[in-house]
A protein has these predicted regions:
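Membrane-embedded alpha-helical bundles of multi-pass enzymes
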Residues: 2-212
Length: 212
């Protein structure tokens, strides 16, 4: 894979991460996560098939994470404009904070690079890894647990009632798993798998609603 193609994919992942930020309040466009996370996972597997370097896997996760956090935490820099003594921190909020948080996404991908396969077992492994590193993000260095992707469900009080039984981070794991389930329908687009994945994701949501 050429450097030009790799750079293009990193840029594309930045855009995917930014698009995922629109699933959070006040937009709550939750459907975009089914696209962004499935493509994210698809590109991880594609890099494995192309035998990319280990460092490339880190930057795959980092690019997606940076796009997500840079877009979803814009309000932090805006809040610093109300006090002139704090305006020097605006570049830190815009650039530094998303970089620090995106490292966890990069680490989550590189931690599982040797296990990458084009199957549902890897979907489970990916979901576990990313949810674990999201948990670490919430507890290390005083913690910064804002903007978990599971916050996408906050538009519905009924959906988040499940937190009572499984907690925030298990809920985050389930969210990542459900959002990424279509990745295996993309080699090439396979309508049979799309139907199976649609049935699976709808069944999960149905069981979810029965529980709550």
């Amino acid at each position: 894979m050429s450097k030009k193609n790799i750079f293009f994919i990193y840029t594309f992942l930045l855009l995917l991460g930014s698009l995922s930020s629109f699933s959070l309040p006040p937009y709550n466009l939750i459907f975009v996560n089914f696209i962004t996370y499935s493509l994210f996972l698809y590109l991880i597997v594609l890099f494995k098939e192309k035998k990319a370097k280990i460092s490339n896997f880190f930057f795959l996760g980092f690019s997606f994470g940076y796009g997500y956090f840079a877009s979803s935490l814009y309000w932090v820099s805006h809040s610093l404009t109300f006090d002139k003594q704090l305006t020097f921190l605006i570049p830190v909020a815009i650039l530094g904070l998303p970089i620090l948080l995106a490292i966890f996404y990069g680490a989550a991908v590189i931690a599982i690079h040797s296990l990458i396969k084009k199957d549902y077992i890897f979907l489970l492994i990916f979901s576990i890894s990313l949810s674990i590193f999201e948990y670490l993000r919430g507890i290390l260095f005083t913690g910064f647990s804002w903007n978990l992707i599971s916050y996408s469900w906050s538009f519905s009080l009924e959906n988040i009632q499940i937190l009572k039984f499984i907690g925030t981070y298990t809920f985050n794991f389930l969210s990542i798993f459900i959002f990424s389930v279509y990745f295996n329908s993309l080699w090439p687009v396979q309508f049979k798998k799309i139907l199976i994945n649609s049935f699976f994701s709808n069944s999960m949501c149905g069981i979810w609603n029965l529980i709550i």
